[in-house]
Swiss-Prot record:
Keywords: Endosome, Golgi apparatus, Membrane, Protein transport, Transport. It comes from the Eukaryota. This is AP-4 complex subunit mu-1. GO terms for biological process: autophagosome assembly; Golgi to lysosome transport; intracellular protein transport; protein localization; protein localization to basolateral plasma membrane; protein targeting. It is found in: Golgi apparatus, trans-Golgi network membrane; Early endosome. GO terms for cellular component: AP-4 adaptor complex; clathrin adaptor complex; cytoplasmic vesicle; cytosol; early endosome; trans-Golgi network. Belongs to the adaptor complexes medium subunit family. It is a peripheral membrane protein. Adaptor protein complex 4 (AP-4) is a heterotetramer composed of two large adaptins (epsilon-type subunit AP4E1 and beta-type subunit AP4B1), a medium adaptin (mu-type subunit AP4M1) and a small adaptin (sigma-type AP4S1). Interacts with tyrosine-based sorting signals on the cytoplasmic tail of cargo proteins such as APP, ATG9A, LAMP2 and NAGPA. Interacts with the C-terminal domain of GRID2. Interacts with GRIA1 and GRIA2; the interaction is indirect via CACNG3. Disulfide bonds: none annotated.
Length: 452
């Protein structure tokens, strides 16, 4: 049983507020929660907080705070599960969960809360049941873009661009509008991996970890059967080997409760009948043993002068991806000693950009091709920088410099080597149009740290 539910923006602005029992301090409770949250040290706040006789349980999703309050002795895990389910429902009904979509669909959100919770007690979180009662249609904002015209050729003929999933396709509401009877039957399947790496100053690898998920977003009718074929060499644990190749190994794996595994052991096929909406089909983890080289290596060189306070940093970044692959939105973040007053730079490409900000150097590279090597020479004046004793120059890193961290995205690439071989649907709609299937592989950095 919960007393209140509210959604706050990242700045603490209340977007949604619902008082189920009338036994609280009103809307001031939301302001109290945000004051307690921002008053805590560090970036990681506890998901459960206490004030007087009231408990605050919250999750953060897409920059929003979803908060439930209660004065009862309730398991926090059950409330965290409820908040996670509410976040999924709001994303399914509104198309995506963000400050903009919530603001445009306030009436829809309140109608959902009225059906999910009655006097603070959970009634249902099943989309199959809720779709019979929710009458408000989602408001979807689609800004005009010239790129939308690129899919239309001469006399309306399709171009190659029309065969690519539109950027806003995966953010549509799962439930079709009553006035839109021509909504396509589509399935989006994403293999997403988060890479965490720690590299020592001598270049040796100290830690590597891959957290992977297979995410599904289905616009097909609930209960439509589908089969997902994974790489046949996929194995779990070090003792299991499959095929004649090197094998694609993970340490741990878990599946959604709706996944049937009769064909998994023999053919690495997952069979399921998912409901409409989003779900995580499979999660897996791999540590300390990647089948391929790390995507990036950094070779730093540091020179600093005792007398003038001049600091020179030369960075050489090598991309060890295959030549046909590329990394996007690459950013190198390098903390600097205090007191930097100027920066001069020499970059290896005109599309690159480097600037100072918040006590660090930010080096942005929009696109890095596999097998390429980029460099940057950065010279800074640090008047208050203490020089090394007994000598004018030093090649050791001064106090406050580093470690460097990288953020990037790797489209069509998985660090574990796991791939989706096929996605087959048993659903056959009326008419000649077959369901559209979109499969995407993506890796991105979670914590990619290189010591200087």
């Amino acid at each position: 049983m919960i007393s209140q539910f509210f959604i706050l923006s990242s700045k603490g602005d209340p977007l949604i507020y619902k008082d189920f029992r009338g036994d609280s301090g009103g809307r001031d409770v939301a302001e109290l929660f945000y004051r307690k949250l921002t008053g805590l040290p560090g970036d990681e706040s506890p998901v459960v907080m206490h004030h007087d006789d009231r408990h605050f349980i919250h999750i953060r999703h897409s920059g929003l705070y979803l908060v439930a309050t209660t004065s009862e002795n309730i398991s926090p895990f059950s409330l965290l599960e409820l908040l996670s389910r509410l976040a999924t429902l709001l994303g399914d009904y509104c198309g995506s969960l963000s400050e903009g979509t919530i603001s445009r669909n306030v009436a829809l959100v309140y109608e959902l809360l009225d059906e999910v919770l009655d006097y603070g007690y959970v009634q249902t979180t099943s989309m199959e049941m809720l779709r019979n009662f929710i009458q408000t249609e989602a408001v979807v904002s689609k800004p005009f873009s010239l790129f939308d015209l690129s899919s239309v050729g001469l006399f309306g003929a399709e171009t190659q661009q029309s065969k690519v999933a539109p950027s806003t396709a995966a953010s549509r509401p799962v439930l079709a509008s009553r006035s839109d009877q021509s909504q396509k039957n589509e399935v989006f399947l994403d293999v997403v991996e988060r890479l965490s790496v720690l590299i020592a100053s001598n270049g040796s690898l100290l830690k590597v970890d891959v957290q992977g998920e297979i995410r599904l977003k289905s616009f097909l009718p609930s209960g439509s059967e589908m089969r997902i074929g994974l790489t046949e060499e996929f194995c779990v644990g070090k003792s299991e080997l499959r095929g004649y190749g090197p094998g694609i190994r993970v340490d741990e794996v878990s599946f959604h409760s709706s996944v049937l595994l009769e064909e998994f052991e023999s053919h690495r096929i997952l069979r399921l009948q998912p409901p409409q909406g989003e779900l995580t089909v499979m999660r897996y983890q791999l540590s300390d043993d990647l089948p391929s080289p790390l995507p990036f290596r950094l070779f730093p060189s540091v020179q600093w002068d005792r007398g003038s306070g001049r600091l020179q940093v030369y960075l050489k970044l090598r991309c060890d991806l295959p030549p046909k692959s590329q990394a996007l939105n690459v950013r190198l973040h390098l903390p600097l000693p205090r007191g930097v007053v100027s920066l001069s730079q020499e970059l290896s490409g005109p599309e690159q950009k480097a600037e100072l900000g918040e006590g660090a150097l930010r080096w942005d590279l929009p696109r890095v091709q596999g097998g390429s090597q980029l460099s940057g020479l950065f010279q800074m004046d640090v008047p208050g920088l203490p020089g090394p004793p007994g000598q004018g120059h030093s090649a050791t890193a001064p106090l406050g410099l580093g470690p460097a961290s990288l953020s990037f995205e790797l489209p069509r690439h998985t660090c574990s080597g796991l791939q989706v071989r096929f996605l087959r649907l048993a659903f056959r709609p009326c008419g000649s149009t077959s369901p559209h299937k979109w499969v995407r592989h993506l890796s991105h950095s979670d914590a990619y740290v290189i010591r200087i």
